[in-house]
Amino acid sequence: YVNKDYLSTKMIDLPYAVKLKKRKHNKKYDYSNNNIDRSNHTYLDYLSYMHKNPNCNVWQLDFLGTIKSDSKSILSFILPNVHFTIIDIIKNPNSQKVVNFFDQLEEKIGTENFIELIPVILTDRDPCFTDIEGICFSKITGEERCKLFFCDPYVSNQKPHVENINKQLRKFFPKGKSIDNLSKKDILNKNLTLLNTPIKSLDSNTPIDAFKTVYGEDLFYKIFDVVNDKQK
């Protein structure tokens, strides 16, 4: 974007950047999906929106790569400011099942909470993320519940936080090992283990602690369908 003069910043203002080698694009997957109209949903649109709404929560969305023979895939969804990650396992994933994931999340936490907590989603051009209307609009109200933006093709570093989480998830889901034997309950347990791990950048607090502090305990328990001990 600097090279193409989309931004006022020039390369001479970025002394570290000129030392970097040009990034090679990974073309293992074809995420171009040229038949999809992403007008107003591009990465440049995302930058423009965030310039106008700098304090907006931005969640990053991705699928963790699995072996080709698997019928199941793991969806990872992260809120970087508190390192809060929601993961789910989806059999034979497609765009409708991704929409179902967000519909179910909205049903759990309520439309008002969804709009406040998840105003912006940034993802790649995976074919499963192409139902823009289904993701962005509430099945309950028919109104817009979030904004969805796509990274440029083959530029995974535009959503670095979810890429980093995917690396951490490899501790639970090693490359080359099938996940088809895992259930939703297995994934929930691993998700909670990840969220209960202290993180240095959170002053050695856990993502669960950070999320509860910023967004409240009730919202956390609604997301994971867990009974709050204080409410028993």
Task: State each model region's role.
Residues 1-164, 168-178, 182-183, 189-192, ...:
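Secondary-structure boundary/capping micro-motif
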